[in-house]
């Protein structure tokens, strides 16, 4: 169990490594972390206007060039996975027994009219929907996955307070697990009345029950702590109780999601680990090329001494200054005795630097991080501009999709465990809420046309491998639950109804309905026999 006698950057680094370094790497603050860049900036050979402003660059023309591939590496799986997360549905169907248990506590959890709590029909789904609304979950998926990839881990915490039942997501550096594996501390640095405090939230399993506790420490200038008394802690944090016990809960509510967990790195590692050296070399090569181009890229004119003397003489006669050479005098010139005349010299900029070396480094970074080259549209000069089929696109993105599917399955498990913890909190106060791991619907990672989507799902429905409700949900992934239920009812109502007569003799035609008689009332069968 952590002993909070001091809290500073070293405490964070001891548990989580140098996560702030990887954040700077992602944000493109390379001129602050790479030694070669800092040295050139200090010498004045290059500048970084974004980091240091234009006042440092008034005598420098070459910028520090950053091709930030470290930004794409975590963003690509975040983009693929986040767009594939659909609605969250309960595994239970609404039943009368659960509806009868609705009470004022249920009404407090769900945003419904206060005077008619019985209007809540599907309690379980309403509670899950309320958790999503309170958590703004639809807006959190991309950031959650990105932060987990970047830091190497993500923390999820369920809360039930005056803000409602919700999920909160925290960066890795607040998470401090206990050595015995039976608890966890979350440490937040907060400021109250211009005074810095360390707020520690502890969850610990004792004899099969979960004990939670809030602690507050005063931080001095040397970052050492002094525990604040309980009465003052309640006042500063605005809480009536600092400790709670949840009988029967044998594991913490807090859920931690590591990235690429191993025995050597049980809390996970950043996806950018080991990529900083190659990123530095890419920036260095591009910046060195820029310096070379700045010095040698502009065209220069080479002329003989005789021509230069003639130009200076004309400038002296015309302007009184031999240095004011008129460019019009260069349009017509003469040859010297050796046939030499004016020459225009310009370096071939395509030969400057090692662009192929940069491409190889980028390719190596993508390979090590399991990122498809095509997903960043990198090698475009030799590719065809014709349209590709969905299968071709799939194989172009194959490596990234494999990585994204693994992240997707882990993220779904992470969300299910978090929602189960939130439902556990709700059930503790209200038995009408059932504890479960809900179903999370998935959408395609690769965008497909509306036509392809409908054809795929309709085919599954007609071949009886998919239900009507699932078909409607997948055809309308952004529709609300109310709309889906109404659409399902409309489709069911429009189906041809069956009765005992139709089941025995088949569905009636218009002629059968008219008693097998024509519009004049004559029997159709007799007329056919006469003929």
Feature-to-residue mapping (PLM):
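C-terminal structured domain segments
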Residues: 449-473
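C-terminal amphipathic alpha-helical
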Residues: 138-149, 157, 291-297, 350-451, ...
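Short, basic interhelical loop/turn and adjoining N-cap
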Residues: 477-485
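Extended, helix-rich architectural segments
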Residues: 1-183, 520-531
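Extended, regular secondary-structure scaffolds
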Residues: 145-151, 155-269
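Extended, compositionally biased alpha-helical segments that mediate assembly or anchoring
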Residues: 487-531
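Amphipathic alpha-helical protein-protein interaction segments
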Residues: 152-159, 466-474
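Extended, charged amphipathic alpha-helical segments
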Residues: 235-392
């Amino acid at each position: 169990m952590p002993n909070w006698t001091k809290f500073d950057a070293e405490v964070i680094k001891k548990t989580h490594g140098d996560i702030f370094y990887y954040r700077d790497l992602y944000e493109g603050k390379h001129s602050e972390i790479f030694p070669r860049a800092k040295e050139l900036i200090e010498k004045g050979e290059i500048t970084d206007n974004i980091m240091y402003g234009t006042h440092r660059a008034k005598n420098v023309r070459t910028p520090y060039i950053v091709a930030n591939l470290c930004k794409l590496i975590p963003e690509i799986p975040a983009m693929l996975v986040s767009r594939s997360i659909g609605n969250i549905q309960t595994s239970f169907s609404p039943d009368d027994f659960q509806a009868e248990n609705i009470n004022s506590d249920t009404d407090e959890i769900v945003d419904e009219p206060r005077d008619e709590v019985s209007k809540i029909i599907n309690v379980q789904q309403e509670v899950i929907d309320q958790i999503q609304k309170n958590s703004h979950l639809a807006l959190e998926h991309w950031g959650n996955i990105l932060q987990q990839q970047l830091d190497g881990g993500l923390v999820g915490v369920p809360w039930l307070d005056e803000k409602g039942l919700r999920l909160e997501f925290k960066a890795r550096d607040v998470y401090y697990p206990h050595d015995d594996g039976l608890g966890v501390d979350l440490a937040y640095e907060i400021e109250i009345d211009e005074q810095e405090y360390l707020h520690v939230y502890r969850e610990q399993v004792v004899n099969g029950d979960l004990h939670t506790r809030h602690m507050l420490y005063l931080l001095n200038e040397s970052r050492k702590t002094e525990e604040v008394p309980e009465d003052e802690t309640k006042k500063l944090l605005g809480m009536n109780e600092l400790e709670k016990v949840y009988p029967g809960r044998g594991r913490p509510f807090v859920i931690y999601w590591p990235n690429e967990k191993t025995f050597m790195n049980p809390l996970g590692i950043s996806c950018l680990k080991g990529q900083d050296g190659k990123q530095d070399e890419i920036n260095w090569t591009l910046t060195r090329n820029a310096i070379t181009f700045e010095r040698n890229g502009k065209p220069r004119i080479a002329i003989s001494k005789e021509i230069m003397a003639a130009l200076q003489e004309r400038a002296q006669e015309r302007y009184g200054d031999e240095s004011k050479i008129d460019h019009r005098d260069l349009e017509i010139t003469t040859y010297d005795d050796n046939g030499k005349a004016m020459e225009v010299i310009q370096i071939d900029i395509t030969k400057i630097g090692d662009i192929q070396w940069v491409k190889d480094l980028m390719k190596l970074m993508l390979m090590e991080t399991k990122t498809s080259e095509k997903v960043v549209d990198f090698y475009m000069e030799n590719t065809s501009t014709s349209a590709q089929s969905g299968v071709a696109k799939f194989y172009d993105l194959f490596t990234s999709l494999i990585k994204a599917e693994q992240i997707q399955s882990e993220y779904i498990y992470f969300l299910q465990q978090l929602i189960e913890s939130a439902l556990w909190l709700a059930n503790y106060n209200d038995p009408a809420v059932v504890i479960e791991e809900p179903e999370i619907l998935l959408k395609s990672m690769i965008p497909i046309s509306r036509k392809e989507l409908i054809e795929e799902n309709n085919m599954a429905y007609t071949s009886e491998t998919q239900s009507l409700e699932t078909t409607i949900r997948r055809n309308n992934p952004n529709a609300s639950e109310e709309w889906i239920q109404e659409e399902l009812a409309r489709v069911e109502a429009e189906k041809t109804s069956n009765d005992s007569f139709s089941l025995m003799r088949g569905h009636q035609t218009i002629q059968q309905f008219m008693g097998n008689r024509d519009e004049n009332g004559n029997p159709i069968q007799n007329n056919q026999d006469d003929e």
